Swiss-Prot record:
Keywords: Calcium, Cytoplasmic vesicle, Membrane, Metal-binding, Repeat, Synapse, Transmembrane, Transmembrane helix. The gene is Syt1. One of its GO terms (molecular function) is phosphatidylserine binding. Residues 186-434 are annotated as: Phospholipid binding. Ca(2+) 3 binds at D284, S287, K288, D290. It comes from Drosophila melanogaster (Fruit fly). This is Synaptotagmin 1. It is found in: Cytoplasmic vesicle, Secretory vesicle, Synaptic vesicle membrane; Synapse. The chain crosses the membrane at residues 108-134. It holds the Pfam family C2. Belongs to the synaptotagmin family. Ca(2+) 4 binds at D356, D362, D416, D418.
Amino acid sequence: MPPNAKSETDAKPEAEPAPASEPAADLESVDQKLEETHHSKFREVDRQEQEVLAEKAAEAASQRIAQVESTTRSATTEAQESTTTAVPVIKKIEHVGEVVTEVIAERTGLPTWGVVAIIILVFLVVFGIIFFCVRRFLKKRRTKDGKGKKGVDMKSVQLLGSAYKEKVQPDMEELTENAEEGDEEDKQSEQKLGRLNFKLEYDFNSNSLAVTVIQAEELPALDMGGTSDPYVKVYLLPDKKKKFETKVHRKTLSPVFNETFTFKSLPYADAMNKTLVFAIFDFDRFSKHDQIGEVKVPLCTIDLAQTIEEWRDLVSVEGEGGQEKLGDICFSLRYVPTAGKLTVVILEAKNLKKMDVGGLSDPYVKIAIMQNGKRLKKKKTSIKKCTLNPYYNESFSFEVPFEQIQKICLVVTVVDYDRIGTSEPIGRCILGCMGTGTELRHWSDMLASPRRPIAQWHTLKDPEETDEILKNMK
């Protein structure tokens, strides 16, 4: 054989594997096509699901929009109906008002604006009367409730727990306990005024009653510092002509007085018809003295044949505790020892007793320097017409040597001026050697602070009582 033929035969078996690679490629292409079809099917399913969800969302949104539109339509229709119903009513009221005003204007002859103004004033007056009546009724009701049962007291409120609910709404058991204990606490509060120790000795030979104010204790604190400046007034009821005062004890709630006062010319038969009064006051230089309490001892209830010494609780009083309301006066004192000059400045008076028929007075003030029952010097202020609270601010000077200042008395008298008849004294204050209580304290403060004016309020005393004191100076 030729060599070329041999090569052809050899080359044929080498070219036979080519058909085997063709079916593998076909398989790969088939797999790719299958995958693509699967992916396309999944994509179509996803698209269909998304389209379904979108359609459902669109339907829900359309339903919500329809509901909102229906509610808005109903609201607008209701508003339109209300406005349509309210407008005619308002128009009717306005029409009636115009007709009424025109009728009133025609009958009275006033302009329409005048009629409208009168109607408004009438409505305001009626409304004010109704408001005043309601407020007065509520005020009376509050006062009645305050005087009635006390369900919860301040102590129980303070003892409540830290929980806010307990503070706002306490338990019913606590309320009932407080209601039951209300009377006992009222009694305890009445006993917080303190008590007084005194001694009584009656002398049948001289027909005199010696009263000793020994001490007091557990007095209430009336000053800002938690203390008081107590003093005691002693007098007999019903005449009240003779009154005595103890010294003022500064900043104490348990003062010790140990002062004795004697009521002379008091027969035993007359003493049985009288009541001995101990009135305790808190001294205040610049305002009216506050009464702490009092002790009343009817002499017919005790045995005057023996010496009596006892403690008694103070009782609260309304008003002045038997003291006449003559008024108060404020004046200042200044003494210069080197020059022997006493200056009295009458500042003002207040709440004076009504002396005239019209319920007023024409007050002026007389100032007198007295020694041994004799009047050495006198001066007086101007007259203030028709007033119970006169203001003077008038200064007066007296020459009083230092050797004589301890022997004189300064008598300040408020007098009601009368053009026709005699002028009547309203009340009086006595300072100096015969002064007692607050008057003596004022005089002592003046001497202790030379060259400096000392101002103080004083309660006016009965002129008849002070006349007896001045007579005893002789």
